[in-house]
Design a protein with these regions (language model features):
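Functional cores of ribonucleases/endoribonucleases
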Residues: 53-130
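Arg/Lys-rich, positively charged N-terminal/basic patches that mediate binding to nucleic acids
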Residues: 2-63
Length: 135
């Protein structure tokens, strides 16, 4: 007898991914920084880049989120042509270090029926998974 492993259903809808906790909607903060379209962050990026495994105050977490969003906004402003996948560096102190280091991140830009686009910010190791799931 072959044992079957239950696979979770593929989540292809942005709202369903937010409800499932796979994506974190950071659109309100993005709007404060002049980003005019919906923005989400993947759960792994949220856990590594925003909340970390150190005890950070809510103010520190908000500051880290704003740093990531501003780095994305500055990269976007410097582009003459926008592609569906954009790399951008951000300075973050990743535990256990307290010294900010350049961290490569990516933005996956997709068409959105109600906005021009929506963006998901993710870690480099999540890029191939995202591209595979789009195919």
């Amino acid at each position: 007898m072959v044992e079957q492993t239950a696979q979770p259903p593929a989540i292809r809808d942005r709202e369903a991914a937010i409800q499932a906790g796979i994506l974190i909607d950071v659109t309100p903060t993005a709007l404060q920084l002049g980003i005019t379209f919906p923005v989400t962050i993947t759960r792994p990026l949220w856990e590594v880049g925003i909340v970390t495994n150190q005890a950070l105050s809510e103010e520190d977490q908000t500051s880290r989120l704003r740093d990531i969003l501003m780095a994305f906004r500055l990269r976007l402003a410097g582009l003459t042509t926008v592609s569906p996948l954009i790399d951008f560096p951000v300075l973050l102190a990743l535990p256990p270090s307290h010294v900010p280091q350049p961290v490569p991140l990516f933005a996956l830009i997709q068409a959105d029926p109600t906005h021009q686009a929506n963006v998901t910010l993710l870690l480099p190791n999540e890029v191939s998974l995202s591209i595979t799931s789009l195919n």
